Amino acid sequence: MPDRSLPPAQRALFDALLDHGLSEWVARLPAQLADGLDRKRFGDLPAWEKAVAKLPTLPEARDVALDSDSVRVDLALTESQQRQCENLLRKLMPWRKGPYTLGGIHIDTEWRSDWKWQRVAPHLSPLEGRRVLDVGGGNGYHGWRMVGAGAAFVLIVDPSPRFYYQFQAVRHFVGDADGWRTHFLPVGIEAVPPKLEAFDTTFSMGVLYHRPSPLEHLMQLRDTLRPGGELVLETLVVEGDANTVFMPGERYAAMPNVYFLPSSKALAHWLERCGFEDVRVVDEAPTSLAEQRSTEWMTFHSLADFLDPEDATLTLEGYPAPRRAVLVARKPE
């Protein structure tokens, strides 16, 4: 049984995994949490932890909207409380995924993640009552939206401790309004027990191109799903036929860890070779400068700075500019 002295969010995660029959994972959680939140590995972690801990006690009465473009929590804050909250939330910058509106504080994130959700959501099997895994889920924006769409249990796994504390900050505002259905574990997919076959839907959005072994990643995703479960895959692609795969040099759009960019047709073939059925390309389009940009909450360089200033169809390195595709596939029964 979980230690009752754990922070509420961690205790809720233990309880949820037990409730969903994932006791094998529960045994691994203490070590995974200790590793993912290791102060020796992450020098800024104490500052993020302190910022979340200093958020003030909030009024019980609140209106929480997890199904709106901006994940929103409306509650009555004094001017002093709102100023304190905003200062603490800014200590967790940069905020990359969102947007959020928390107690009247609008967090205008680098990515308009709501636009991605609008492209993805119409093509999903209904999430009502489903168990969902969100691999590389950032600070949890899409996880909240999944619960807003009716998911019974959402587990976000992402190895970034900054994202973990951004999620916990949002959790502070949401409170228990989601019925403790949304959870975050600061680990990568490698920490998911092998052959788990526990989730009805698994998302991997913005992860595949960071993987030096993309087929291994697809098979890891497959093994998280129950028979008949659904995979939602979003990644960078290039234009071309079923044999087109591009591997950039040291950097792509200034990112150092980008490996394989297939065409959407090649990616569909990869999914089929990895044992998926009913593979569909449901969306494909260039990433727009309006969707990814610098803001007051993410003040560093963004997409506009990574493109050729003379030709926005090319990256700084001369490669095709970012283009993303969404594919949906099913694991056989």
Swiss-Prot record:
InterPro entries: CmoB (IPR010017), Mo5U34_MeTrfas-like (IPR027555), SAM-dependent_MTases_sf (IPR029063). It comes from the Bacteria. Keywords: Transferase, tRNA processing. It catalyses: carboxy-S-adenosyl-L-methionine + 5-hydroxyuridine(34) in tRNA = 5-carboxymethoxyuridine(34) in tRNA + S-adenosyl-L-homocysteine + H(+). It is an enzyme of class 2 (transferase). One of its GO terms (biological process) is tRNA wobble uridine modification. Catalyzes carboxymethyl transfer from carboxy-S-adenosyl-L-methionine (Cx-SAM) to 5-hydroxyuridine (ho5U) to form 5-carboxymethoxyuridine (cmo5U) at position 34 in tRNAs. HAMAP family: tRNA_carboxymethyltr_CmoB (MF_01590). Homotetramer. This is tRNA U34 carboxymethyltransferase. The gene is cmoB.
